[in-house]
């Protein structure tokens, strides 16, 4: 019964718990959940789904809705999950350890949702050695699709040749995107 209700929440169909994104900004999500408006420090549509699932689970377990939303509004992103780092010159870096092409695409789509147009998106993509070689070129292609500049690195090469890792990643970089792509070993 619980899993059925939660699956309804995530399907964008009629459900016991409803959520609407009012604003998705770098400062967080402004949402209406079951007619209560609340600000969350997390960003991105995927986090809105996660928040709604947590809310629904807590309510089904008997918690008070206002208390649940208050607690959830104080949540911070896990380290390395769209984590914001700012410097004293007003530059913002978002760190995310996306480790699949789909995850990287979702992160970059999220960032592009709240860009005003003047910012430059520079994406650093590292792939470790002795890991899934098939995703290397796909991650590079995703980075090139959504970014003004791309920096490819071999991260932790382990027993692999760092240059070979970068060669694999460059297979996902089209000829037209090579000028905006930098390799660093």
Predicted regions mapped to residue ranges:
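Short, conserved catalytic or adaptor-binding loops enriched in Gly and charged residues
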Residues: 8-12, 84-87, 142-143, 171-176
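Nucleotide phosphate-binding/pyrophosphate-handling subdomain across enzymes
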Residues: 36-149
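Extended acidic/charged loop-beta regions that coordinate divalent cations
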Residues: 1-37, 78-81, 85
């Amino acid at each position: 019964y619980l899993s059925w209700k939660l699956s309804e929440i995530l399907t964008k169909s009629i459900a016991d718990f409803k959520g609407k994104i009012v604003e998705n900004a770098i400062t967080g999500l402004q949402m209406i959940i079951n007619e209560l408006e609340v600000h969350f420090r997390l960003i991105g549509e995927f986090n809105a789904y996660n928040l709604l699932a947590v809310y629904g689970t807590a309510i089904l377990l008997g918690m008070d809705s206002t208390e649940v939303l208050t607690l959830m509004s104080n949540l911070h992103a896990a380290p390395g999950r769209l984590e914001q780092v700012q410097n004293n010159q007003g530059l913002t870096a978002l760190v995310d350890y996306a480790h699949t092409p789909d995850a990287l695409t979702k992160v970059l789509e999220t960032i592009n949702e709240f860009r005003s147009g003047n910012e430059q998106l520079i994406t650093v993509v590292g792939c470790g050695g002795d890991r899934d070689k098939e995703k290397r070129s796909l991650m590079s292609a995703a980075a090139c699709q959504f970014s003004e500049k791309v920096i490819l690195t071999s991260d932790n090469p382990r027993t692999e040749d760092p240059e070979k890792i970068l060669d694999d990643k460059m297979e996902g970089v089209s000829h037209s995107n090579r000028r905006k792509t930098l390799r660093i070993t």
